[in-house]
Amino acid sequence: MMMTACDDGRRRVYESGDKGESWTEALGTLSRVWGNNHKGHERGVRSGFITATIEERDVMLVTLPVYSNSNENEKGELHLWLTDNTHIVDIGPVSEKEDDVTASSLLYKSGEANEEELIALYEKKKGDGESSLGMVSVRLTAQLQRVKDVLTTWKEVDERVSKLCPSEGATEDTSTGIACNTVKITDGLVGFLSGNFSGNTWRDEYLGVNATVKKGANGVATGYADGVTFRGAWAEWPVGKQGENQLYYFANYNFTLVATLSVHGEPTEGDTPIQLMGATMNNKNTVLLGLSYDKEGKWQVLCGGKTAKELRSNSDPGTTHQVAIVLQNGTQGSAYVDGQRVGDAPCELKSTDSKGILHFYIGGDGGSAGSKEDVPVTATNVLLYNRPLDDNEIRVLNASKVSIPKLTDLKTLAAGTTGVGTARHFGANGDGSADCGGGLLPLLLLLGLWGIAAS
């Protein structure tokens, strides 16, 4: 693998599977995740970049500076990042805040548990106007333990998600004959929102990017065991909104967003459709791809800000549905309801490369938030993939969806507070071809010829 800083302000990662004869940009995973465009700072800090096997998992460790948004001229604090080529976590700071770091490197020694060592070497300016540089060596004992803790969490969450679709016991969709054991539902799974909700934060179970709850004037978001119920409120899961470092940059090219939802009612006459889930662009908040539900009981696909396709629903309000939106190659969008594609073919989209996705929205988009007629929407088991799932995989996921209890007391919800433990009443039923040549760092980080196989 190879990482380089480019003139467009982002660090690109390239992969080679033929001993360096050809290189392909890793747009679906690590490329363009980290920024290189901090104003008032030199072109870029050379990063440390190594691979290792820790806790029986192939991972990559990277050191790169992190800047706050408040001070454009500040010195970036060097942070350690962990990735397994699917998930990415900021482990935390390595350098001192006053250090003006210009380059860094990592050393990892494996062996028995008490012999493992992770060391960061970084070059810094001495300050006081001096042009000479100094070297610092830091033993990252606490950071290595944090790496192990994160890897343990990833493993545990993988196991939890896998149980949503048991591979044994021949769990099968009787209408399609598709068994859960035909698909590995954690393949390419980057983010997972479930029951970890408090305050205005819906936390990613993989410790990556958290979603933030937004509310209208009368909005309420209420957490329960496995998800959140929104009324006049919604969740935003940031992509471009993350700032300089965008862990979900892959979503501008390929993604699948899946959620189990229940709409506790229907829009009344004259009301706009309920915006259930979608991806909002950076330009004037245009919806790139989304799914809504109208007063006539029809599912509508929003494609490039316009309603493109519809599918009539024969179910009653409060029925549990699994919905999904899929983006392929940044130009083709599809939507699914209960494993069935809405429309016969994908809708054609303009490339997202130049504008970029701002965030995903779930449970609403703020368009009509605050209205007394807002219909509650419950969302649970929200899954974000870094690849487009095919029709078969969508059907398999649908076959394993968990039923959401019906909401019976809307007055209690309206009076509730945001956070875990709020009272809830349920019924008994249960492309990437831009030239980087002029933006290469003096030191190009080339790590031998290896690859991390996505597990």
Descriptions of predicted regions:
Residues 1-45:
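Beta-propeller domains
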Residues 164-431, 452-455:
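Extracellular glycan-associated modules
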Residues 28-46, 84-112:
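Conserved blade-ending motifs and adjacent loop-strand segments that build the rim/top face
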